[in-house]
Curated annotation (Swiss-Prot):
One MF term in the entry's GO annotations: ATP binding
PANTHER family found in the cross-reference section: TRANSCRIPTIONAL REPRESSOR NRDR (PTHR30455:SF2)
Organism: Pseudomonas fluorescens (strain ATCC BAA-477 / NRRL B-23932 / Pf-5)
Residue intervals of the ATP-cone domain: 49-139
Full protein name: Transcriptional repressor NrdR
Cofactor: Zn(2+)
Keyword field contains Iron-sulfur: no
Length: 154
């Protein structure tokens, strides 16, 4: 690895540790030319499947769009950023685990609803109302009644 201070090619690893729940390797390095120390982080580059929209068009997976949609549903709800990020990691893991190059956007929507239901039922109802295009109060009631009948998902 090139030294960010002097540009030399020769660096040695002093220390390596797993971070981010084993998803990253943190390495402390030292330049053999100038002696400066610096930290690098390694993550596996995993390709997310492309999404097939309901109209048949295809687009790349957009983590920021997913995060924004979940944040909108969780707005003013008592859910930490850490729990949201963990839910995002879980959704991405499930999508990669399909082994498919393309997945229907409906699959992503269902995964989001499952994770939101675990995080906060109000956020789940908010998201479901938009995602499933609730037309009237009866549809809200039916979904709330269904939630009330289910055992808590944690």
């Amino acid at each position: 690895m090139h030294c960010p201070f002097c540009g030399a090619n020769d660096t040695k690893v002093i220390d390596s540790r797993l971070v981010a729940e084993g998803e990253q390797v943190r390495r402390r390095r030292e330049c053999l030319a100038c002696g400066e120390r610096f930290t690098t982080f390694e993550t596996a580059e995993l390709v997310m499947p492309r999404l097939i929209k309901t109209d048949g068009s295809r687009q790349p997976f957009d983590e920021e769009k997913l995060r924004a949609g979940m944040q909108r549903a969780l707005e003013k709800r008592p859910v930490s950023v850490e729990r949201l990020e963990a839910a995002l990691v879980h959704i991405k893991h499930k999508l990669r685990a399909t082994g498919e190059r393309e997945v229907k956007s409906l699959v992503v929507g269902e995964l989001v609803m499952t994770e939101l239901q675990k995080l906060d039922e109000v956020a789940y109802i908010r998201f479901a109302s938009v995602y499933r295009r609730f037309q009237d109060l009866n549809e809200f009631r039916e979904e709330i009644d269904r939630l009330a009948r289910e055992p808590a998902k944690q």
